Structure formats: C-alpha cells, structure tokens
Amino acid sequence: KGTDKNYDLTLVDGSLDIAKAKINQVTGITADHRTYDATTNATLNTVTAQFEGIVVGDQLTVATATGKFNDKNVGTAKHVAINNISLSGTDSNNYDLVKNTAQTTANIGKANINSITGITANSRVYDGLTDASLNIANTQFNGLYSGDQLTVATATGQFESASTGQNKTV
C-alpha cells in the first residue's frame, strides 16, 4: 500500500538475477619446506587460506591449487608460484574467483647421498708409505637423482699398512 490515498498500487510478479560475488584473491596459502628431489614441485597447505571478498558467515575452502618453485635447486625463501586455485565449500557456488594465482616462499634443503661406490685403489710398488692413489673414473653416487651429475673433486686413500700384500684394505 502506498501513503497517497489517490492511488492504488498493483505489484507485478517478476524475476531478478542475483550475480555471484567476487573473490578478488586468495591469500594465506603456504608451501611446505622440503628436501631436494630434482623437481620444482611444491606441496601446498591451504588450511590457512583467506578469501578477499567473502561474505561474513560463508564457508569457502580451496578445492585445488598447484605449486611450483622457480627452480629445483637448494635455497631458502625460494619463490613458489601458486596456480590453478579453485574454490569449494558450502557457499562456493555463490562466488567467482577473479584471480586464481598467488605466491609464497619456502625452503629446499640438501638431499643426502646414501653411499658412494666404484672408487678403487691402484696397485703400486712398495715404497714404505701407506698412501694410495685412487681411481675415481667409475664412481657411482647412490641417492643421486636422474639427470643430476656429481663428480669427486678430491679423494685420498690409505692402505691399512705399508707392507706388501694382495687385496689390501684401503
């Protein structure tokens, strides 16, 4: 009803559209620190994600996201690009994600070489010393990732004693 007695107000049924709200960006995604594994893959933690533009009381979570370090090498506070962020949660159908990328940092620590094999001592003539010259041409590093290369920079060896003998321990 209107407030003017000179008019009758007639309401007509109609339809309206309610547009989705926009999440401008997702922040708070972190990457786990990890040990070197010859890849740029980063494991993400989305539990602390925050959604810029969410209506108070709505429930959103990160459905998917991928993380990549800029390179595979060891380092601290390395840049991690976060891509392909998508939303889930009870109220996710009410939102469009404007920016599906983010960034963070994480550390890559050194990997361990489990063992080194293939280094042999060269036979020699008795000289009263225990020094052994080593052949490193066939060195193998157990724990080395495919595609990576390591070499032995220096190696020293000592015979268990200076006396002559066969199959002596070095």
Describe the residue ranges of each PLM region:
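Short loop/turn motifs that initiate or flank beta-strands
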Residues: K1-V170
